[in-house]
């Protein structure tokens, strides 16, 4: 059985780590370099760095900060936020990131997935999908620009398309559950896991050990969390000990 991964998210705004609830009410959570080092020490398998306002503000990612964090880490480090071209993605890899993720730019130009996977390798291209459930149709729609713009893309169909175009992994965030700490959106995650063969990272809503157990049992390859680590509710090691007890294969 493949090892399940625990991923810590660093949402960056103005050079600081922040955390919101359902993509709003942002509050400060600390220094990114210090937190990255701490999370690695605490047993996290990967770190995802998201410059949360780069896309909205139409500016480039904070490269100096990426370099600074990359220097300190030995675990895989994925970076995204506002990346629009293959050149920018290559630049971020040169700064020390292991993988890059794209979101809004992939929706606007799906060919970017194809081009980037050819140049930096499919396994280094992650497509992030921010999705929200439509109450009337019960369908999940893709949102872009930090969750501020609704598209008419069905999230499950878009996930399939991303795989076809060469994405190596999907980072799926449910906007309905983000930051609420009441559990991952199992319905959305399962629909996407069943639709694709590439790894799926579930994101949005982790609050306790049971949430990780649930999401791994429906087939997620990795589970991303932010609030529970930032506010010291659990360390990755605590989590993994509990997961191991119920037979989930994790790296201790």
From Swiss-Prot:
Chief location of this protein within or outside the cell: cytoplasm
Highest taxon of the lineage: Bacteria
Catalytic residues in the record: 11, 130
Protein localization: Cytoplasm
The keyword Transmembrane is annotated on this UniProt entry: no
GO biological process terms on file: L-histidine biosynthetic process
Similarity comment: Belongs to the HisA/HisF family.
Subunit comment: Heterodimer of HisH and HisF.
Protein name, as recorded: Imidazole glycerol phosphate synthase subunit HisF
Species the sequence originates in: Petrotoga mobilis (strain DSM 10674 / SJ95)
Underlying gene: hisF
């Amino acid at each position: 059985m493949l090892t399940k991964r625990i991923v810590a998210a660093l949402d960056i705004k103005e050079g600081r780590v922040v955390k919101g609830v359902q993509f709003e009410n942002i509050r400060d959570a600390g220094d990114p370099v210090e937190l990255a080092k701490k999370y690695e020490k605490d047993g996290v398998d990967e770190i995802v760095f998201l410059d949360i306002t780069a896309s909205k503000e139409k500016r480039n990612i904070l490269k100096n900060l990426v370099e600074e964090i990359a220097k300190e880490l030995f675990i895989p480090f994925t970076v995204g936020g506002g990346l629009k071209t293959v050149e920018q993605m290559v630049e971020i890899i040169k700064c020390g990131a292991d993988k890059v993720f794209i979101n809004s730019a992939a929706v606007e130009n799906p060919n970017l997935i194809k081009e980037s996977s050819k140049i930096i390798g499919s396994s280094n291209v992650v497509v992030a999908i921010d999705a929200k459930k439509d109450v009337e149709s019960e369908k999940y729609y893709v949102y872009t620009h930090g969750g501020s713009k609704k598209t008419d893309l069905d999230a499950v169909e878009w996930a399939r398309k991303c795989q076809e175009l060469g994405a190596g992994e999907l980072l799926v965030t449910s906007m309905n559950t983000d930051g609420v700490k009441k559990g991952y959106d199992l319905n959305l995650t399962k629909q996407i896991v069943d639709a694709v063969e590439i790894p799926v990272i579930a994101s949005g809503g982790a609050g306790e050990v049971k949430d990780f157990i649930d999401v791994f049992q429906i087939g997620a390859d990795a589970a991303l969390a932010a609030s529970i680590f930032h506010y010291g509710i659990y360390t990755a090691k605590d989590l993994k000990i509990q997961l191991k007890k119920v037979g989930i294969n994790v790296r201790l």
